[in-house]
């Protein structure tokens, strides 16, 4: 954020519904339509006209649908670890990670252990205070992830959603940058290349 600000950009990090510090949807509605609607409302409220949208995973999918289905205009789109074609095994691993300890973790040490098991390549922090931003303290005194558990049953990943992403990608004419984490098991190199074949004007960083 500081780097973008120094370059003259006005950067806003959006916590989508059910994520981070945003409220959870009382009706448990986390479909693509609602996500796109929320995004459009925020952009309208900011009065920023045509923004540059940067999204990772779900945020990238929301941005792709919003732009590709002509729901809003943007100056450019940056998608991180997300494309119409993703790896089922990688997505299943995320689901498994999300579904563990549904009643919460007893301590930040347990949270750190769960993250270390999910991302063994990352160095485990000595100071666990920073993990507090990833969890919230529930009424039962346990730590739960900073997302609504109802999302576990409404995560977009069905074939019809993937087909929707494919169709949206066909309509992209604005500048696009696809970023893939080198160790990503969700977006493979093949998945990235498939998107580049579909959107040949896009730039790519691995």
Residue ranges with predicted function:
Residues 12-14, 56, 80, 179, ...:
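The conserved SAM/SAH-binding core of class I Rossmann-like methyltransferase domains
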Residues 137-198, 203:
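Conserved serine/cysteine hydrolase catalytic core
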Residues 7, 70, 198:
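Conserved dinucleotide-binding and phosphotransfer motif residues
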Residues 10, 49-52, 73-76, 175-177, ...:
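Structural signature of beta-strand start/N-cap positions in the alpha/beta core
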Residues 2-6, 10-54:
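Active-site loop/oxyanion-hole signature of alpha/beta-hydrolase fold enzymes
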Residues 19-22, 85, 186:
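Active-site loop signature of alpha/beta-hydrolase-fold enzymes
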Residues 85-147:
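Helix-rich cap/lid subdomain of alpha/beta-hydrolase
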Residues 45-90:
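Conserved hydrolase catalytic core segment
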């Amino acid at each position: 954020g500081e780097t973008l600000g120094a370059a003259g950009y006005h950067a806003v990090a959006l916590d989508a519904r059910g994520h981070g510090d945003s409220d959870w949807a009382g009706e448990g509605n986390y479909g693509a339509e609602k996500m796109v609607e929320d995004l459009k409302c925020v952009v309208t409220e900011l009065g920023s006209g045509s923004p540059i949208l940067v999204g990772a995973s779900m945020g990238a999918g929301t941005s792709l649908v919003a732009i590709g289905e002509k729901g809003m205009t943007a100056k450019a789109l940056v998608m991180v670890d997300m494309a119409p074609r993703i790896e089922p095994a990688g997505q299943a691993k995320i689901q498994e990670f999300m579904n563990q300890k549904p009643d919460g973790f007893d301590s930040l040490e347990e949270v750190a252990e769960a993250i270390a098991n999910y991302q063994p390549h990352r160095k485990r922090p000595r100071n666990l205070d920073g993990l507090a931003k990833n969890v919230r303290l529930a009424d039962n005194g346990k730590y739960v992830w900073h997302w609504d558990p109802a999302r576990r049953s409404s995560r977009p990943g069905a074939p019809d959603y993937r087909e929707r992403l494919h169709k949206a990608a066909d309509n992209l004419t604005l500048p696009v940058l696809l970023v893939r984490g080198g160790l990503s098991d969700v977006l493979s190199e093949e998945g990235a290349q498939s998107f580049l074949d579909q959107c040949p004007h896009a730039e790519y960083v691995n």
